[in-house]
Amino acid sequence: MDVIKVEGGHEITGEVTVEGAKNSALKLMAATIMAPGVTTLKNVPNIADVHVMGKVLKRLGATIDVLDKHTLVIDTSNVDKWETPYELVAQMRASTAVLGPLISRFGKAVVAMPGGCNIGARKIDMHILGLEELGVQFDVKHGNIHATTPNGITGNTVTLAFASVGATENLMMASVHAKGTTIIDNAAREPEIVDLANMLNEMGAKVRGAGSPVIEIEGVGELHPVTHTVVGDRIEAGTFLAIGGLCGKPVTVNGFDPIHLGLVLKKFEKMGLVVQREAHGCTVWREGPILPTDIQTLPFPGFPTDMQAQTMCLLALAKGSCVITENVFENRFMFASELQRMGADITIEGHHAIVHGVPGFSGTQVKSPDLRGGAALVMAGLVADGVTTVSAIHHIERGYEGFVSKLVSLGAKAERDTVPDDEDAIRD
């Protein structure tokens, strides 16, 4: 069993550079299906989810060459399949991102229901309802989504009930070749949406309004391959900046746009952290106690759900009490029970977490419940008394490249280790 061991109490300070955004890279990889030929993606994170998406594309007929650690050359000239295998899709929810591109290229698709972190229902109803407005017909059976377009794809106005990132992306990609114009109302506004729109436009698409609540896609003919650089990962950046605030000494994070963490950084300042913004990075440190601050997660430009666990870790050591409200995923407080094992005082009431600050954490064995919760447990171990051992780290490795090595570069005493499974039997 693979674990991350962290010894608390060491000074954490220094500088790190984040990788390309996981949530952007996966969708950009899927989008290459729509432009037959050779597309080069740069600044791609070397993480488990990217490896899975690569396998999905290969099963569909693509070839992928790895030029270097962060550059992929994807040739989709010979993609001739439109069905994704369950054993791959079950590993990663983002694999549904191929639904729109396959419909766009072939007019049909068979996609297994998604997997990934178990942090909510993550229903794809909005994907299906939205695509139906464009003329796509669906039959969901035996764990697979069967999509067909007997009359082609026709532009329409689609109003999303919730600003879903995945639904917005699938609608954007499916409508690129539609007859007429598609308007997505109440579209997701995340930076990763803008990154996808930028690459689609580079390929020859006509996408306008990305980053706003209304996106307009004018149908075009063929797309052409491009070379594109993935936007920096704002969530990885936020994680390391939160570490700077937790541990106290300055941590500088490069390789991202601080505007993409707008509300997070403002909340950090309300918590008493010092935030120094630069053009392509940011530095965070702390000169006094952590101040209690209420948080509620919302789609961008609101507070990201992907920063909720890391922020809870900070607030668990605040001088007072506060409330964290989770409005995006219903099961994203699973991490709280593990943090309680380390001494946190947290009460869960529905989609609210009441957090009472405690003086410190105690190192112990904890189990990563999901990607961000796992990272937050490692983060807590940096300031805990004694050694913290985090298991189920495959969740962490889905989204963070070289997490331990970056922590070590900042001064942490941490290591990735393998221990006998029976040592963790009581935690399973």
What are these language model-derived features?
Residues 1-428:
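Structural preference for solvent-exposed beta-strand-turn elements
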